[in-house]
């Protein structure tokens, strides 16, 4: 643990078995479950825990695998976004039911390791259009062992992005530093009596790793001034001069409690494992432009998996049957108890009466006799709305996904024949409600509209009834099924040729149903050095996108609401987008080529190339959900990646792992996540106003990336000490130029043609020492406290403008509106919207019993 144990001398190369050992490049037996026809990285927990990771969970370090990058949604592979991966726990699906991102977060102390595949699939593999991440949990040990860890961590306050010249907000929100403390206790060992009775070896593994954290948030309220009385706010056309009104603050108390309980029985060729793993957590989120009671919403989540697995391993036969149940629940409540039972008011002004903030109301009252700036509004709400009263919309989400999987592999001479199948059914239920039973909206003083949910019937005719309801309940269901047949032919111990066909079914509700997804997959690998110490491989594979249940709000149903202002009524039945006739599933074709060599347990080198083409992207257009494009411009994504890595161990107490990659991703379809829009559930804005200028480098175009991980062991003053570091640098994302028009967001210039955002670099450092069996560590994340922009505001103008087809950045100075005047550039254009996370320091201790 933590890399302070003495390293044994290099030994002779043994059979590579499953191919996971450092001195192995591939499994030596074609009967093994792992696919050798692509780029897979085995990240042992014993290795990850030697790096500066503090109390990280597995979803935070999956991007350490070769071929991986990272976007705002998670680790990204092969040009895909961070919500296109498949996440599994010991082979059982554990993706988030709503979006497809990681759901059950597993502490590294619970893991045996992470098996990450960046590309290259065989018919047996459950895959989508991204990567696959399998978290392999700790098993029992021959003797009773207890591993105890504790960390205390402080993350500095993040820097607020700069505000645009001339912009104003009534209240601005800032986040303070975040102290947190984590403890982890993991016990493993044998279970004597049951194992003896059943004639085998029984074992257990159990762990708990609670984290307690607190974060301070503060609001600064200010008003405009007009000291010279000229009717123009002071400071314009530059930064506004503001007069402070008040500062308010709150502090959250957040927690996370992951827990694991496992038992297993090994009896001859039979292996049975029963697993319960999950997490209970609490967190808060806040609005900026709101009174304190109306600003906060608390989230209480519970996520977990129950997994039962039987494996049979005979000399010529491997079999597996696995049943699993994934559950998640997210309950929202008002952060302030006083905001739980009253309606929220969203207004285009600051009300003159605010029971929860009378000081702000008085300072912003333009009708007050004490108003010091009578010719300008004190507190204009220029964009969005000001929230007061209750907490507003609260949504509870509960999801369940039972699944069953079966696999059989049989050796027949030089062939290994595999057959198998899987079935997953997801139910996602949402319950939405407004505090106080309604949400009030006002565009002007004296005008008020009440928004409520309804069930049954409703019309815009006030004389007709409308069945108002206190809450709206919706249920979304998805079904995924697959079956495969695969043949691996090994004409010699060093060569294996694989061919297979996978059939998949993907249904989302009653209208979006793909039942004939056929995926041929081919692969060949050659071990020129023998013994599993090398491999050359090539593969071709087709995959189809896994569609999450959250897509139901796009294609099944949304909440039904109506607005009533006393004189008129407007209802929204919550109709989803119509699924286009003849819609095709998202299909991806992939080719990989690579070489890997592992020598004497001290050196491993990998060279890898990957090409992917996504066709039939799914997205919303005007009132319809389908495959956008008119035939000439279709929704596609094309990726090419080349990567190289080198790992060295046991060389003068030094371990080094380094990698470099270059990638290109172009097309018209960004996928279900976009840095500007977030997770959009395939109803983004790209295709709403046409396809002009959509083709170009996509946000997942990774450019150049490099990383170095290193560890050095030694002795200092009688102590075993070590220094470990991880350095990473990568190109910024491609930059586009957009416009906000009455038709929606349009691309003024070809996508990604305005250069790239700044390079992102980060250095992490760990110092550790061991004394009398106790290991102390100091981790520094983002050592140099770099705060470079991660994303910029790409909206150039908010005006009636049209795309400059095939234009360049220099053409923007000539941009005009439909009315013939020059377009006005927004002062927020190219200002940072997100910065790198700040420096974080963690002190840890570890003890093995």
Q: What does each model-identified segment do?
A:
Residues 374-385, 472, 523-630, 635, ...:
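Solvent-exposed loop/turn elements at secondary-structure boundaries
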Residues 175-283, 298-320, 520:
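Transmembrane beta-barrel wall of Gram-negative outer-membrane proteins
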Residues 494, 606-740, 844-846:
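Gram-negative outer-membrane beta-barrel transporters
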Residues 194-195, 202, 269-274, 282, ...:
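Repeated loop/turn-to-beta-strand initiation elements of outer-membrane beta-barrel proteins
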Residues 717-720, 726-742, 768-849:
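C-terminal beta-signal and adjacent terminal beta-strands/loops
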Residues 2-139, 169, 184-192:
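Periplasmic N-terminal accessory/gating domains of Gram-negative outer-membrane beta-barrel systems
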Residues 148-156, 204-212, 274-280, 321-327, ...:
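Transmembrane beta-barrel strands of outer-membrane/channel proteins
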């Amino acid at each position: 643990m933590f890399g302070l144990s003495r390293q044994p001398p290099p030994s002779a190369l043994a059979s590579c078995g499953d191919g996971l050992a450092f001195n192995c490049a591939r499994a030596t037996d074609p009967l093994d479950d792992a696919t050798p026809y692509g780029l897979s990285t085995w990240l042992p927990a014993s290795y990850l825990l030697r790096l500066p990771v503090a109390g990280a969970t597995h979803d935070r370090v999956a991007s350490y695998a070769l071929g991986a990058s990272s976007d705002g949604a998670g680790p990204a592979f092969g040009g895909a976004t961070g919500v296109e991966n498949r996440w599994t726990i010991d082979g059982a699906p554990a993706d988030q039911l709503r979006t497809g991102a990681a759901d059950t977060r597993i502490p590294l102390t619970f893991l045996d390791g992470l098996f990450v595949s960046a590309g290259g699939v065989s018919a047996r593999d459950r895959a989508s259009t991204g990567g696959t991440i399998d978290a392999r949990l700790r098993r029992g040990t021959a003797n009773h062992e207890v591993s105890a860890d504790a960390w205390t961590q402080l993350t500095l306050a993040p820097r607020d992005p700069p505000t645009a010249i001339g912009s104003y907000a009534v209240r601005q929100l800032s986040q303070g530093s975040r102290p947190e403390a984590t403890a982890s206790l993991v016990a493993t060992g044998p279970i004597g009596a049951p194992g003896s009775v059943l004639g085998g070896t029984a074992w257990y593994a159990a762990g708990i790793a609670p984290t307690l954290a607190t974060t301070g948030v503060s609001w600064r309220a200010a008003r405009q001034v007009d000291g010279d009385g000229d009717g123009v706010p002071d400071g314009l056309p530059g930064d506004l001069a503001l007069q402070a009104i008040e500062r308010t603050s709150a502090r959250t108390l957040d927690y996370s409690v992951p827990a694991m309980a496992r038992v297993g029985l090994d009896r001859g060729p039979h292996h049975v494992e029963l697993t319960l793993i999950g997490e209970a957590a609490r967190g808060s989120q806040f609005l900026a432009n709101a009174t304190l009671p109306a600003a906060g919403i608390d989230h209480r989540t519970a996520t977990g998996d129950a997994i039962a697995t039987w494996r049979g391993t005979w000399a010529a036969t491997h079999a597996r049957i696995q049943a699993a149940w994934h559950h998640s629940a997210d309950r929202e409540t008002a952060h302030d108890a006083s905001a739980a039972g009253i309606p929220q008011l969203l207004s285009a002004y600051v009300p003159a009466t605010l029971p929860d903030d009378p000081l702000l109301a008085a300072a912003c009252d333009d009708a007050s006799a004490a108003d010091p700036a009578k010719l300008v509004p004190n507190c204009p709400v220029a964009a969005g709305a000001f929230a007061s009263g209750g907490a507003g919309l609260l949504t509870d989400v509960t999801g369940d996904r039972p699944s069953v999987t079966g696999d059989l592999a049989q050796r027949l001479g030089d062939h290994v024949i595999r057959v198998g199948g899987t079935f997953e059914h997801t139910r996602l239920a949402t319950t939405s409600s407004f505090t106080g039973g309604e949400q009030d909206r006002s565009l002007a003083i004296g005008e008020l509209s009440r928004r409520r949910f309804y069930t049954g019937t409703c019309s815009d005719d006030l004389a007709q009834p409308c069945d108002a309801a206190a809450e709206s309940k919706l249920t979304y269901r998805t079904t995924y099924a697959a079956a495969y047949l695969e043949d691996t032919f090994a004409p010699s111990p060093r060569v294996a040729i694989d061919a297979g066909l996978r059939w998949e079914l993907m249904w989302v509700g009653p209208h979006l149903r793909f039942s004939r997804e056929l995926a041929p997959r081919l692969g060949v690998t050659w071990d020129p050095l023998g013994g599993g110490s090398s491999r050359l491989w090539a593969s071709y594979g087709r995959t189809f996108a896994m569609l999450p249940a959250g897509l139901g709000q796009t294609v099944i149903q949304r909440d039904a609401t109506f607005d009533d202002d006393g004189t008129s009524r407007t209802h929204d039945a919550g109709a989803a987008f119509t699924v286009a006739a003849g819609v095709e599933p998202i299909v991806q074709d992939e080719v990989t080529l690579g070489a890997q060599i592992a020598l004497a347990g001290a050196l491993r080198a990998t060279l890898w190339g990957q090409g992917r083409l996504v066709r039939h992207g799914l997205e919303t257009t005007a009132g319809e959900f389908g495959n956008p494009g008119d035939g000439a411009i279709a929704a596609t994504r094309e990726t090419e990646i080349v990567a190289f890595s080198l790992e060295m161990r046991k060389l003068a107490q030094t371990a080094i792992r380094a990698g470099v990659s270059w990638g290109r991703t172009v097309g018209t379809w960004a996928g279900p996540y976009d840095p500007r829009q977030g997770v959009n559930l395939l109803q983004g804005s790209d295709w709403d106003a046409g396809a002009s200028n959509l083709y170009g480098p996509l946000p997942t175009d990774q450019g150049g990336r490099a990383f170095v991980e290193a560890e050095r062991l030694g002795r200092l003053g009688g102590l075993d000490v070590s220094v470990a570091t991880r350095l990473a640098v990568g190109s910024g994302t491609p930059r586009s130029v957009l416009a906000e028009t009455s038709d929606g967001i349009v691309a003024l210039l070809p996508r990604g043609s305005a250069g790239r955002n700044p390079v992102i670099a980060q250095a992490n450092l760990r110092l550790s020492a061991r004394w009398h069996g106790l290991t102390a560590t100091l981790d520094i994340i983002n050592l140099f406290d770099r705060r470079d922009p991660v994303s910029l505001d790409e909206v150039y103008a908010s005006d009636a403008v049209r795309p400059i087809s095939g234009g360049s950045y220099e053409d923007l100075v000539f941009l005009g509106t439909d009315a013939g005047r020059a377009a006005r550039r927004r002062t927020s254009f190219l200002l940072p919207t997100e910065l790198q996370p700040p420096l974080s320091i963690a002190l840890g201790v570890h003890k093995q019993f």
